[in-house]
Every structure is written in structure tokens, then in C-alpha cells.
């Protein structure tokens, strides 16, 4: 399997283009760009400057020069614009963001677009899933045309918390361009049996987020790989059982002071664990 680095790990220390090169220097084969927020620049056609086609092409060029891939795009901006929102205008904005991200991903050479999906408090999980499925059915033709995959992540929200929830969403959308981005750390923090989840999801998993969790003063906190509660031998066994050999994307936040150290320690831990 190949290792990828999510931008949250390193971009507090390095700007995007340098971060991509640094990821390669640290022994990673991929980089996940997080489109985290649009700030005050608007929506839809008004993408922030760093995420315009010209800048995304620059990121792809930096990755090629460094000898790594842009493995995926993460639409972190969806934490602001929920595709499950009861507000039709917000849903429309989220839909347009998701649709347009397909072209950006293709330009970057990324095959996967991570969709972190929140659930508004006033909706039941069933209502939120219905809204999400409607949005994704609208968007998947763009992904199919671009040759990329929208991957719904288990971020801990009730609408997509379990393997069965994720299978329902993917089955209802019914497109090869809609699959699952499984986060082993999030699943562990929610009490899931990760190996069983992964085997149930099987080939629907197109990418994995890897991070660890530990409890500190009663709170769950993200930890370096191997320093928390995740059953890593179980993760490795499940990967073998389902034939997963894609990217493992590290998502352990680093500060300007700790970014390199966190990336190296997590890389080494994953290799020691045989993942």
C-alpha cells in the first residue's frame, strides 16, 4: 500500500506547493489537498484563488516534479455548506461545489474526492441520508464524465456512522462514481469494530484515512499512529482480506513545530505494523 499525507498534517508549516514536495521528502507517495473554506470569496463559480484550475494545475506539476501523486481532494468546505442542509439554497451551493470539484480533481490527477458529510441537528439520520442521496445523484454524472469518484466518509455523524449507513448511501446513489472513504480512527472513536466494518464494505472502500485516538482527561484526541486505541493489526488483516492496496492517507494534525516529526513517526509506525 502507498502512503499519502493530508494537508492538515503539514500545511501549518509549509505552503501548498512546498508541502507537496516535503511530503515526498518525508517518504510519502501521495498528497491530499483539503479545500477547507471559501472564506468571503463566494460560492459556485467563485473558487478561492488557490483552488482555481491554474493553481490546481500548479499543484499537479509540483507533485509530478516531486515524484508523488495528488491522491485525492478533500472538500472540507462542506463542513460550512452541508449538502444535507434543510435550506435549499445551501444545498444548491453544496451541490455546485461537489459538481465542480470533479473537474478540479481530474486536473490534479486525483481519482478520489473525499466528502465529509455533516448532519444538521434538526434532521433525523434518515432525513439527512435522503438529502445526501438526492444531491449525489445530481452530481455523479460529473464524476463519471471526469473519471473520478466521490467518496463518502464516516466522520462520526449519525447519517453515515456505520458500515450499513455507508452501504445504504452508496447503493441508493447506484453509480461506480460514488463509493466510501473509510476512516479507521473515526470508526474506532465511535466504538466500531473496524475489521468487521471493512470486510462488510469490501470493494466499496476506495481510500482509507489513518489516524489514532486516545483518551485524555475523558476526551478523545487524535494521536500519532500506534499511540492510541486503533487495532492496527486488525486493519492490516482487513486490508489483506478485501484486497485493498490503495492509499493510506495520514490525517494527524501537525503544528509548525511538530509537522515533520508527526509525519515521520506515523510513517514509521505504519511500516512497522506491516500496513
Residue ranges and their predicted role:
Residues 80-81, 120-123, 156-160, 186-189, ...:
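Short, small-residue-enriched loops and turns at beta-alpha junctions
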Residues 1-107, 137, 175, 203, ...:
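N-terminal pre-domain/capping segments
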Amino acid at each position: 500500500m502507498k502512503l499519502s499525507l493530508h494537508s492538515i498534517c503539514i500545511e501549518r508549516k509549509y505552503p501548498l506547493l512546498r508541502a507537496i514536495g516535503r511530503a515526498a521528502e518525508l517518504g510519502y507517495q501521495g498528497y491530499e489537498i483539503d479545500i477547507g473554506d471559501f472564506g468571503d470569496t463566494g460560492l459556485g463559480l467563485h473558487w478561492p484563488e488557490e483552488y482555481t484550475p491554474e493553481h490546481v494545475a500548479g499543484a499537479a506539476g509540483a507533485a509530478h516534479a516531486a515524484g508523488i501523486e495528488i491522491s485525492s481532494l478533500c472538500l472540507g468546505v462542506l463542513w460550512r455548506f452541508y449538502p444535507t442542509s434543510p435550506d435549499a439554497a445551501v444545498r444548491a451551493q453544496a451541490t455546485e461545489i461537489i459538481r465542480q470539484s470533479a473537474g478540479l480533481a481530474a486536473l490534479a490527477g486525483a481519482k478520489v474526492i473525499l466528502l465529509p458529510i455533516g448532519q444538521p441537528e434538526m434532521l433525523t439520520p434518515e432525513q439527512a441520508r435522503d438529502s445526501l442521496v438526492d444531491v449525489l445523484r445530481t452530481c455523479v454524472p460529473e464524476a463519471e464524465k471526469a473519471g473520478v469518484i466521490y467518496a463518502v466518509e464516516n466522520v462520526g455523524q449519525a447519517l453515515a456512522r456505520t458500515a450499513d449507513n455507508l452501504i445504504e448511501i452508496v447503493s441508493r446513489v447506484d453509480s461506480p462514481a460514488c463509493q466510501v472513504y473509510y476512516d479507521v480512527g473515526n470508526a474506532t472513536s465511535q466504538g466500531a469494530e473496524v475489521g468487521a466494518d471493512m470486510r462488510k464494505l469490501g470493494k466499496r472502500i476506495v481510500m482509507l484515512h489513518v489516524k489514532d485516538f486516545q483518551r485524555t482527561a475523558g476526551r478523545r484526541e487524535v494521536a500519532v499512529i500506534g499511540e492510541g486505541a486503533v487495532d492496527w493489526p486488525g486493519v492490516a488483516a482487513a486490508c489483506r482480506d478485501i484486497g485493498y492496496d490503495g492509499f493510506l492517507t495520514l490525517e494527524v494534525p501537525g503544528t509548525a513545530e511538530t509537522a515533520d516529526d508527526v509525519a515521520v513517526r506515523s510513517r514509521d509506525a505504519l511500516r512497522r505494523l506491516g500496513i
